[in-house]
Structures are given as C-alpha cells and as structure tokens.
Amino acid sequence: MPSFDIVSEIKLEEVRNAVENANRELSTRFDFRGVEASFELKENIVTMSCDSDFQLKQMLDILRGTCVKRGVDTAAFEEKDVQHIGKIYKQAIAFKEGIEQPVAKKLIKMIKDAKIKVQASIQGDQVRVTGKKRDDLQQVMALAKSSDLEQPLQFTNFRD
C-alpha cells in the first residue's frame, strides 16, 4: 500500500550559510557602519544583537532575505522576545522542527474532513499517510501544501 510521511525539517547547513551571508551583508550595509551588530548561530537558534530596536527589525529583514535566497522557509521562524541588556538589544530566533502534536491533529482532521480515502497517523514528530491509490496521496499532498498551519511541510519516504 502506498504511503508517505509529512515532516517539518530545516536544513541546518543552509541556515548556517544564510547566517554567514547575513553577517557579510551587515558589514557592507551603510546604515550599519560603526555599529556593533551580529548574527550568531548555536544549534538551531539564531541570536541577533545590535545597538537599537530599529536595527533589530532591519536585521530580521536581512535574515529573512538571506534565508529565502538559501531555500529556508521563513514560516519555520519562531521569534522570541527582545531583550535589552545595557546598551545592547538581543533577540533570539528559533527554527521549528518536527510537527507538534496540536498541529499534527489539525492536519489529520483536515485530511479526514476532505473525505479522501487515506489513513493518517501521528508517528512522533511526523504524520504518516497511507492509501490504496497514488492519486489519493497526491491529493493529500496538495491539501497539505495549500493549508495554513504556520509551519513548513515536506513530504518524504514515498513508498509504493
């Protein structure tokens, strides 16, 4: 019976490249001359630090742009609160990986409401979809892509 998995993953290498490109862009931008500003990547959290709140917003736009260029979906961004420490503003951005339980339940409910003849089940941080026909699975893929679940979805492990 054909099946596939719906997962939410990011490529950490591409995130690392995007952060390096963003740091490079910071060093060439005129409005960031003479300003202590940087991006730092540790595990799957990017920390932005600079002198003002306004510059943090600009840095976030730079990071979004470089992530899009590298093929990282910005829907995976989870922005944390801005911290003001002395004269430095810091903000952390975590990348969501894996489909959380409530999102997985919404996805399964959406598939069942569409009345497509498939079975969907939660397996850890992914959703497995099985069905008798490939066409049904492709309908589920189209449905998942068109859904607005605030999380990027990829399809892996397609088996016949």
Curated annotation (Swiss-Prot):
Gene Ontology CC, one term: cytosol
GO function terms (MF aspect): nucleotide binding
Record-linked Pfam families: DUF520 (PF04461)
Entries under InterPro entries matching the protein: DUF520, UPF0234-like_C, UPF0234_N, YajQ-like_sf
Keyword line: Nucleotide-binding
CDD domains: YajQ_like
Function: Nucleotide-binding protein.
PANTHER family: UPF0234 PROTEIN YAJQ
Family in the record: Belongs to the YajQ family.
Full protein name: Nucleotide-binding protein Patl_4311
Species of provenance: Pseudoalteromonas atlantica (strain T6c / ATCC BAA-1087)
